[in-house]
């Protein structure tokens, strides 16, 4: 069942009533309903080439990477906060480091604090034994304490890393931050079974020496893997990554679920979210049910949000001014078990935000 919404101002309760009555009338198989409420626009004067959104103390933040090449050829990593209909820049973290080039960014958000790591980015084949990182700590989202740390790279020496925002993962009553990587490609089986690995910190990112073993038997030879990101929800671990001939020719987008086997070991297997003529964008959960976003493979003026693989919303991005609207980089930002934001860039400097509510009907 596809439920299209194109109006900007519809009350939450009106939508709930319509959806519940509709589902009753057609005898929906699923007992779960999700709906989209008001659409809002946010403007950004900074040309971000990468956005990393998160919720902290009930407010929306963005880590913006500005690395456009120009006369100055400078890199900026801004921490921004949503204030009304704009992103307000609070801090430029990169200028407080001695790093060169575009770094890896790993952000960890807990109830009371934000911890952001900026780590030097070298090609995995040229990576040094140790990796220099700057650890930024904040308990208000505005001011950040900076300390330089060194991470021994023996665990992830041959792994390709990608930037992401994550929650802590609790294993046997201890919380860990994870940095995870994937073998970018293999031409022959080396029987190591370490194609995906994570190193972990139990002291909020100050030291990194714990190895998390990820057992994944569906790694294929002769293809490239990239953009690996862990998903942590209610202490369940999953991964999202891309598979293709090369980074510009994506053949598939994989999502794998992991089960804690013993100690610091997990067993992971594929979860099939692939749909014909649709490109998987992002995955999250609401009340233990998956919510998945897709772009239209042939027309990014449309994107879809599926809940429980049954009900879906069709989103046609609304124009802001005279710009051409699209649905690019769709990302879920979970508020709680009943609400999530769906954020995408509709045009340069313009972000569309949809609020999605979870509801039950009897």
Curated annotation (Swiss-Prot):
Keywords: Cell membrane, Cytoplasmic vesicle, Disulfide bond, Glycoprotein, Host cell membrane, Host membrane, Membrane, Secreted, Signal
Summary of the protein's practical applications: Potential candidate for the development of parasite blood stage vaccines. In vitro and in vivo, induces neutralizing antibodies capable of inhibiting merozoite invasion of host erythrocytes.
Knockout consequences: Conditional knockdown causes loss of cell growth and severely impairs merozoite invasion of erythrocytes. Attachment to and deformation of erythrocyte membrane is normal, however the subsequent step, which triggers an increase in Ca(2+) from the attached merozoite into the erythrocyte, is impaired.
UniProt modification remark: N-glycosylated.
Phenotypic consequence of residue 66 to K: Prevents the interaction with c2 neutralizing antibodies
Top-level division of the source organism's lineage: Eukaryota
Gene Ontology annotations of biological process type: symbiont entry into host
A cellular component annotation (GO) from this entry: plasma membrane
KW Secreted (keyword) present: yes
Glycosylation (residues): 145, 322, 338
Impact noted for substituting residue 338 to D: Loss of N-glycosylation
Oligomeric and partner information: Component of the PfRH5 adhesion complex composed of 1 copy of CyRPA, RH5 and RIPR; the complex is formed during merozoite invasion of host erythrocytes specifically at the interface between the parasite and host membranes. Following the establishment of the junction between the merozoite and the erythrocyte, CyRPA dissociates from the complex. Within the complex, interacts with RH5 and RIPR.
Role played: Essential for the invasion of host erythrocytes by blood stage merozoites. Required for the assembly of the PfRH5 adhesion complex (or invasion complex) composed of CyRPA, RH5 and RIPR at the interface between the merozoite and the host erythrocyte membranes. This facilitates the binding of RH5 to host receptor BSG/basigin, which leads to the establishment of a tight junction between the merozoite and host erythrocyte membranes and allows Ca(2+) release into the erythrocyte.
Annotated protein name in UniProt: Cysteine-rich protective antigen
Species of provenance: Plasmodium falciparum (isolate 3D7)
